[in-house]
């Protein structure tokens, strides 16, 4: 479970990825955000969406993002440095 600092960091990063502010991250938004991390392919985006979008609705909800972030703390620390 995320502590208050970790939750605040998840909130901040989620808002960076959720460019249109609709409360969910689309594949397009994910791709745009990941371009900041370097070269990313369409297949990379599809693979990440499949992993993080656990309910399969085509979007990453805040809960799905938070669950992924909590399970991948090292990766999220790296992402936080960039965003």
Curated annotation (Swiss-Prot):
UniProt entry tagged with the keyword Metal-binding: yes
Cross-referenced PROSITE patterns: EF_HAND_1, EF_HAND_2
SUPFAM superfamilies from the UniProt entry: EF-hand
Binding site for Ca(2+) 2: 53, 55, 57, 59, 64
Position of the signal peptide: none
Cell membrane recorded as keyword: no
Keywords for the protein's UniProt record, in alphabetical order: Allergen, Calcium, Metal-binding, Repeat
One Pfam entry name: EF-hand_7
GO MF annotation list: calcium ion binding; enzyme regulator activity
The EF-hand domain, residue ranges: 5-40, 43-75
CDD domains, per database record: EFh
Binding site for Ca(2+) 1: 18, 20, 22, 24, 29
GO cellular component labels: cytoplasm
PANTHER family: EF-HAND CALCIUM-BINDING DOMAIN CONTAINING PROTEIN (PTHR10891)
Protein name from the UniProt record: Polcalcin Bra r 2
